[in-house]
Structure formats: structure tokens, C-alpha cells
């Protein structure tokens, strides 16, 4: 397999670094000046015995099959809102906190190049197994410090500006039209329920949508070319990577000491996805060159073409990271939205009323203008993210010494921030067990929005290192939910008391044979 050569070095745009650096230095000095001998030492933070903790994950142990939310919540009950998860087998200790003041302290002191460790298996693969491809460009998932800052600055304008998404409105609508036809094909003609494995269909839809952005092509996995071998390889590997990461980097694992079967599977998975993505992008590059040689003027509007202009190597890495970070997480979120709406038909009816005003016919086109007028749609998605948090929280590595819950936490410590768990607590969200999209809208009487701590609602992270794909996911989710609810009344007639589990991210714990009834008008 030929590796795409690097035509140019990564463009470096530092932007308003001086003001950010000044703010970072100020925060550091404030944190440093507030540390006194009265604060407890790091060694006094509550924690389990290292060997008992390791034993809990072994066969027959308390956490053998536990999700990250289950075992961190169990430890929270035992040790309180802050505790240490002991490191082992080459992984350092992690401090875990559920205190919003701690979460704010960590973010306020993260500096201009926030550091997020925790995906060591991917970092090792990129640095030591395939340096021929990655070299100095590790991608946003794996890189740190100045290397991360240079890459993020180079690609921020591509992903974070709304104008970069304009060309995707129509093709994303077409992909969703195809998905609607797929639903009609596979649902039972009598019950109108889709098959038990419908989550696979949802994942194919998400993969198709993200693949459009990542590879400038439709893979055909929804209907047209369901057996496309290259696409299926990318589809399966993108789903496997997160599960393997959980086993290697979150749970205790000896892969840093000996080559375990799980790590060998991870290496094969990463290699397979890399080889296919290189092949696809090489085809794109060759096709683009032919068009240039034919005298065609090329307008680089797509995200992929703009990434290729920076560096073909960056295009390979970002295309992989889009799928790796997006397919399972977004597919699970879509399942959760449909479940919430099916279990709350009054909210579904209210959403459909909004959609009918924007989409008078089922095949009405969605565009940048009319999608601005869908506040209830966005509130539904936002409330779903709160009601079914997609993961435990996020991680940061302290850039300097800080005080967390009265304890001195030294520079270089990795902190697991349990912000997502707080979204289901009445302290921060009144009536937390109710699905209330209205909580995100302005009060019709006062015109005011609900006051929410920014450090309890962080589905896409916070600060300079927040998820770069947020706008892409927002567009995909809004398009899909709008299309589905405009075309169907959705029901779920099964038990949904525990529909999801959180391993590394949230994933389905049950099947979702939704009932899709056509809307007449």
C-alpha cells in the first residue's frame, strides 16, 4: 500500500495566542498563589488499594463486566466526590472528581494547548507501529502540546465555521431520503416495526453521512451497495476501535508489558482502517489531478479538499478520526432521540408541529436558512444528551499544580472529570428524571433561559480542545431527526427501563425495533 506523501508541512496559524497565553499565565499564577500548607496532600486523596482495585476487574470481581459509569459511581459512593483510581501496568494514577468547582479549576488552568491523555494504545500505534504514515502528525486524537496546537489551528477554519457545511445540506438530505426508503423496505407490513437489528441500520446511516464529509463520497451501505468491502472494513473498524480502547486504556490491561490478544486485535484494526482510507484518498487525489490536467478549474469547497490542500497526510488522519470519533457515538445518540420521542408522544407531536411549518411537504428541502428556525428540534437533541449522557465525562492532564476539593494535585496528573454524571442530578437540573426539551428554551413569560452551570453540560467538551466535529454532528443529527419525524410517527412498544450502558461511550443495551407509521400529510 502506497502511503500518501506529504506535499507540504502543516500550515501553522496561532491566532490570538498572546491573549490566551496571558489568560493562562494569570490562571496559573492565581492557582499557584492559592495553594497553601493548609491544603491536604495528594497522598491524602481517598483511593482503593491498588491490588484490590485490579482484582475487581478480574473474573468474578466486582467490576468484571461493569461500565465506566457503573464502577466510577460505585467508587464515588465509597470514597466521595473525589478519589484516585490507581494506575497499574504502565498507566499512571487518575484523579476522578464530580465537583463542579474542581471541573472548572481544571479547565481554567488547561492553558492554550490542553492536554488529554488516556488513549495510549492509539498513540503507541501512531508513534511506533506506523510512523511511516503519521510521522510528526499524530492527529487531534493522539497529539499533545504545540504539535496539537499547530494542527488544531490549521484545521479549525475548516470544521468550526458554518460556511464550511453549506455544500452538505442537500447530499445529507438525499442520504436521509434513502434511509427513509430503507425503513419502508425492512419494516413489517403488519406491525410496521423494523427488525431487531435496526441499530445496525442506524449505524450505517451515520457512517454514510460522516463518510460523505470524510471521503467526499457516498459508500452505498444503506441500500445501493451494502456489501462494499472497503466501506464495510471502515464501518466495522470504526465501531471496534472504541470498544478496544476501553479494554486497553480504561480498564486495567497488561498490553504495555506484553503484547496481549486485545492489543494485537487493536493493531490489526487500526492497520486495516488505515490501509483502506489511504486507498480511498489516493483515488480521490488521482481523480482530482486528472481534472486539473484536463484544464478544469478546481474550487476546493469540500472539507476533504481543504484538508488535502494543507497536507494529504492530514487528510488521511482526519478522515479516520472523523469515523473513529463519530460513528458509534452519533448512532447511539440518534437511537436515544428516537427512544425519547417515542416514549413522550406529546413532545414528538410538538416537534412535528414545528417541522410542518418549515417542511410543508415530506420531501421539502432543508437548507441553511430554514434550519435556523427549529429551536424545538435543537432542544429535543440537547435534552436527549442530558437525559442519556453519551459517556462519563472527559479527561485533562493538569498543566500546573492545582487545588481540587481541598487537595493539592500536582502538575502532570490526569483528571477524569465526571461532568456528564451530574446532568442527572436534581442539584443542577430540576426534575432530572423527566424528559423536558422546554428546559432549554426561553420561558414564554419571562423570556429568560434556564441558568445552567457550563461545567455540568459538556457533551462536546470545553475550551480549545472541545470536539472539532461538533458542527458536523449537529447538522447530521438535525437533518436526520427532522426528516424522520416529518415522515413518521415513531413508537417503541418494548421495555426501556435500562436501554443503554456506558463502556467508554454510551452504547445500546437492548434492541430497538421501532414502529414507523407514515404521516399522511
Curated annotation (Swiss-Prot):
UniProt keywords, alphabetically: Heme, Iron, Membrane, Metal-binding, Mitochondrion, Monooxygenase, Oxidoreductase, Transit peptide
Stretch forming the transit peptide: 1-19
Gene name, Swiss-Prot/TrEMBL: Cyp12d1-d
Family matches, as PROSITE patterns: CYTOCHROME_P450 (PS00086)
EC code: 1.14.-.-
Pfam families linked: p450
Record's subcellular location: Mitochondrion membrane
Superkingdom to which the source organism belongs: Eukaryota
Entry-linked CDD domains: CYP24A1-like (cd11054)
Key word Lipoprotein present: no
Main subcellular location of this protein, as a coarse class: mitochondrion
UniProt cofactor(s): heme
Protein name (Swiss-Prot/TrEMBL): Probable cytochrome P450 12d1 distal, mitochondrial
One of the record's GO molecular function terms: iron ion binding
Gene Ontology cellular component list: mitochondrial membrane; mitochondrion
Family statement: Belongs to the cytochrome P450 family.
SUPFAM superfamilies assigned: Cytochrome P450
Positions annotated to bind heme: 467
Keyword Cytoplasm in record: no
Database matches in InterPro entries: CYP11_CYP27_families, Cyt_P450, Cyt_P450_CS, Cyt_P450_E_grp-I, Cyt_P450_sf
GO biological process: response to DDT; response to insecticide; vitamin D catabolic process
Amino acid at each position: 500500500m502506497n502511503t500518501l506523501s506529504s506535499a507540504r508541512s502543516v500550515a501553522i496559524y496561532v491566532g490570538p495566542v498572546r491573549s490566551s497565553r496571558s489568560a493562562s499565565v494569570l490562571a496559573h499564577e492565581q492557582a499557584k498563589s492559592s495553594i497553601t500548607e493548609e491544603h491536604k496532600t495528594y497522598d491524602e486523596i481517598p483511593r482503593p488499594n491498588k491490588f484490590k482495585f485490579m482484582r475487581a476487574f478480574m473474573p468474578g470481581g466486582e467490576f468484571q463486566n461493569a461500565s465506566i459509569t457503573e464502577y466510577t459511581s460505585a467508587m464515588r459512593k465509597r470514597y466521595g466526590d473525589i478519589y484516585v483510581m490507581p494506575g497499574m501496568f504502565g498507566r499512571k494514577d487518575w484523579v476522578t472528581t464530580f465537583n463542579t468547582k474542581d471541573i472548572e479549576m481544571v479547565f481554567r488552568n488547561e492553558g492554550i494547548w490542553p492536554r488529554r491523555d488516556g488513549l495510549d494504545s492509539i498513540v503507541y500505534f501512531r508513534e511506533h507501529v506506523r510512523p511511516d504514515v503519521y510521522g510528526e502528525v499524530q492527529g487531534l486524537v493522539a497529539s499533545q502540546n504545540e504539535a496539537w496546537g499547530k494542527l488544531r489551528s490549521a484545521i479549525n477554519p475548516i470544521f468550526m465555521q458554518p460556511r464550511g457545511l453549506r455544500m452538505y445540506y442537500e447530499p445529507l438530505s438525499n442520504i436521509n431520503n434513502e434511509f427513509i426508503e430503507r425503513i419502508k423496505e425492512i419494516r413489517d407490513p403488519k406491525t410496521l416495526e423494523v427488525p431487531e437489528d435496526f441499530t445496525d441500520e442506524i449505524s450505517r446511516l451515520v457512517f454514510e453521512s460522516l463518510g460523505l464529509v470524510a471521503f467526499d463520497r457516498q459508500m452505498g451501505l444503506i441500500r445501493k451497495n451494502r456489501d462494499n468491502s472497503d466501506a464495510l472494513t471502515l464501518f466495522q473498524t470504526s465501531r471496534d476501535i472504541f470498544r478496544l480502547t476501553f479494554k486497553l486504556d480504561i480498564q486495567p490491561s497488561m498490553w504495555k508489558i506484553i503484547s496481549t490478544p486485545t492489543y494485537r486485535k487493536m493493531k490489526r484494526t487500526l492497520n486495516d482502517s488505515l490501509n483502506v482510507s489511504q486507498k480511498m484518498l489516493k483515488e480521490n487525489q488521482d481523480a482530482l489531478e486528472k481534472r486539473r490536467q484536463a484544464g478544469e478549474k478546481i474550487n476546493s469547497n469540500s472539507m476533504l479538499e481543504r484538508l488535502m490542500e494543507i497536507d494529504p497526510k492530514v487528510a488521511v488522519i482526519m478522515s479516520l478520526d472523523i469515523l473513529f470519533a463519530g460513528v458509534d457515538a452519533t448512532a447511539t445518540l440518534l437511537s436515544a432521540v428516537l427512544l425519547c420521542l417515542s416514549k413522550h408522544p406529546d413532545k414528538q407531536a410538538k416537534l412535528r408541529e414545528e417541522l410542518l411549518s418549515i417542511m410543508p411537504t415530506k420531501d421539502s428541502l432543508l437548507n441553511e436558512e430554514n434550519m435556523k428556525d427549529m429551536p424545538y428540534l435543537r432542544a429535543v437533541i440537547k435534552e436527549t444528551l442530558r437525559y442519556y449522557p453519551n459517556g462519563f465525562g472527559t479527561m485533562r492532564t493538569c498543566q500546573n499544580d492545582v487545588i481540587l476539593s481541598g487537595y493539592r494535585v500536582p502538575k502532570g496528573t490526569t483528571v477524569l472529570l465526571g461532568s456528564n454524571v451530574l446532568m442527572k442530578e436534581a442539584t443542577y437540573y430540576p426534575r432530572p428524571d423527566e424528559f423536558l426539551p422546554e428546559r432549554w428554551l426561553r420561558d414564554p413569560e419571562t423570556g429568560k433561559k434556564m441558568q445552567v452551570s457550563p461545567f455540568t453540560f459538556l457533551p462536546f467538551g470545553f475550551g480549545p480542545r472541545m470536539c472539532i466535529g461538533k458542527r458536523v454532528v449537529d447538522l447530521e443529527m438535525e437533518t436526520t431527526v427532522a426528516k424522520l419525524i416529518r415522515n413518521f410517527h415513531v413508537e417503541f412498544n418494548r421495555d426501556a427501563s435500562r436501554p443503554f450502558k456506558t463502556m467508554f461511550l454510551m452504547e445500546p443495551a437492548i434492541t430497538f425495533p421501532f414502529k414507523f407509521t407514515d404521516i399522511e400529510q
